[in-house]
């Protein structure tokens, strides 16, 4: 099975949520209580080695958690992520307050609470924060 197919399948929840959101408007954490908490057993905060990928047509996607490392990374890269048109997944988040903290770190970016386990398996990924583009992984 191709890497693209392995990544595309777990993004179904994310795509449904994204399609129902207003453009450029982050989801209100209280409307997402039904999916919280989010846990990603295959992922943890840590260093990600850059790697080349071939996922033509994929919209840039980043994975973050509620940890300090993720929040600092998100704050540092928010402008670049916005320029890329990247969407975010909060792959480790306890509650609406933690989700709101993540979203407020990068106003203007859509960040959804979705487990990253299937993406981690498909891309052989162990850590976040990470940016996934059509051409590679980077931190």
Predicted regions and their residues:
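Charge-patterned, long linear interaction tracts outside catalytic cores
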Residues: 8-11
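Helix-rich interaction surfaces within compact, conserved domain-sized segments
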Residues: 106-114, 119-124, 130
């Amino acid at each position: 099975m191709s890497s693209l197919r392995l990544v595309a399948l777990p993004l179904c929840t994310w795509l449904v949520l994204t399609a129902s959101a207003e453009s450029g408007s982050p989801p209100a954490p209280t409307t997402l209580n039904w999916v919280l908490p989010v846990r990603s057993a295959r992922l943890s905060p840590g260093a990600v080695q850059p790697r080349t990928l071939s996922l033509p047509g994929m919209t840039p996607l980043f994975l973050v958690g509620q940890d300090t490392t993720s929040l600092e990374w998100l704050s540092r890269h928010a402008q670049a992520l916005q320029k890329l048109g990247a969407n975010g997944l909060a792959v480790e988040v306890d509650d609406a307050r933690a989700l709101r903290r993540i979203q407020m770190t990068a106003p203007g970016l859509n960040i959804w609470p979705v487990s990253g386990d299937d993406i981690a398996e498909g891309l052989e990924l162990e850590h976040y924060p990470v940016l996934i583009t059509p051409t590679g992984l980077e931190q």
